[in-house]
């Protein structure tokens, strides 16, 4: 009797079936809270890794909920921070605390953290305005410095498998003298795209950030075929 062995190695790449969420925007205070509560718990939270940022919203909610069950959020301030984190990612936490008592015009800010939203199993979207203004004075030149930003932030998921994020703003600013000197030598606003001059020593620039997010799984399949004769 003779037999031969034929081994087939098949490698396939496919979209992962598990849910996919967008990232928590990188913010110093926001991430300080998360890192602080992990340190307070005295253990490593397995849902996210503090050395790898940004965190996934889905992982964040799973992590802080596990910390809450252990009694980490003890003070009034801790409970406030816990609810804030859950409200900001309510599509995963389903926080009832995020429901507005009096929505604006019945449809706006029905959730405290969202100007507009749609929460369907096949399509999830969150839309929020971006408004920012700041001013100061240059201690060397005495000039008044300022920045004014207006725009929109959009995030969501498609079928909970593909996440997407967009941040768009129009900005006017008078920047410090050393930045303007750099722009004079190399005509570009640092880290920005399209721009033009604006009034006295100011700049007008457009800022855009976006990404899509999905998981890819790599499967290694070994098939052994035995043939007997």
Could you say what each language-model-derived stretch is?
Residues 5-8, 33, 180:
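Intrinsically disordered, low-complexity regions enriched in small/polar residues
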Residues 21-37:
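Short N-terminal segments immediately surrounding and downstream of signal-peptide cleavage
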Residues 25-28, 40-58, 62-229:
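Outer-membrane beta-barrel channel domains
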Residues 1-22:
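Bacterial Sec-dependent N-terminal signal peptides
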